[in-house]
Curated annotation (Swiss-Prot):
Record has Ion transport as a keyword: no
Record region (LID): 126-136
CC annotations in GO: cytoplasm
Record EC number: 2.7.4.3
Protein name: Adenylate kinase
Keywords: ATP-binding, Cytoplasm, Kinase, Nucleotide biosynthesis, Nucleotide-binding, Transferase
Reactions it catalyzes: AMP + ATP = 2 ADP
Top-level taxonomic group: Bacteria
Protein source organism: Caulobacter vibrioides (strain NA1000 / CB15N)
Subunit structure: Monomer.
Predominant place of localization: cytoplasm
Pfam families recorded: ADK
UniProt: AMP binding residues: T31, R36, E57, L58, V59, G85, F86, P87, R88, Q92, R133, R144
Length: 191
């Protein structure tokens, strides 16, 4: 099963993806984690990515698609992928569809975690205090959220038109959101 966890920064995508990895043996393909790893490597690419993320902007489609494509064989071997933070644009979604189709696969379901903006801001402040991620700086977060809303919003009709979009309340506890996700995945896993 290939699924996309969709939602704004701090919606809980990473938390839920990690749980699904543990419980279902899927591979989490988190562009955020991949980009942070590139930065930590100190490579030229990592330095370019750092500058973009520090400004709260989105990394180019070309870079993100290449990172995902490199990890698809690993996901295929595990029997499925959780795409976390990808795709972010319609161009990325179309590229993902093509990459998966070339492997005889597809996206099975898109789960959108809906969280109110004030709750997102509180979550990001808490995460910034606890983890100190530069891209969680409250000022940078406002830019990230605006970029998400402007560039990612067109993906909703893209996946809704394919009958793959399921919207879930992401405002509850980690456990409540997990239960909603599990319920949404039951018919997909059975089908």
């Amino acid at each position: 099963m290939n699924l996309i966890l969709f939602g704004p920064p701090a919606a809980g995508k990473g938390t839920q993806a990690k749980r699904l990895v543990t419980e279902r043996g899927m591979v989490q393909l988190s562009t955020g984690d991949m980009l942070r790893a590139a930065i930590a490597s100190g490579s030229e690419l990592g330095q370019r990515v750092k500058g973009v993320l520090d400004r709260g902007e989105l990394v180019t489609d070309e870079i993100v698609i290449a990172l995902i494509e490199d990890r698809l064989p690993e996901a295929e071997a595990a029997g499925g992928a959780i795409f976390d933070g990808f795709p972010r644009t319609v161009a990325q979604a179309e590229a993902l569809d093509k990459m998966l189709a070339a492997r005889g696969q597809k996206i099975d379901v898109v789960l959108r975690l809906k969280v109110d903006e004030p709750a997102l801001i509180e979550r990001i402040k808490k995460r910034f205090e606890e983890q100190g991620r530069p891209d969680d700086n409250p000022e940078v977060f406002v830019t990230r959220l605006a970029a998400y809303n402007a560039q990612t919003a067109p993906l909703l009709p893209y996946y809704e038109g394919q009958g793959k979009l399921t919207e879930l309340d992401g405002m509850g506890t980690v456990e409540a959101v997990a239960a909603s996700i599990d319920s949404a995945l039951e018919p997909v896993a059975a089908g």
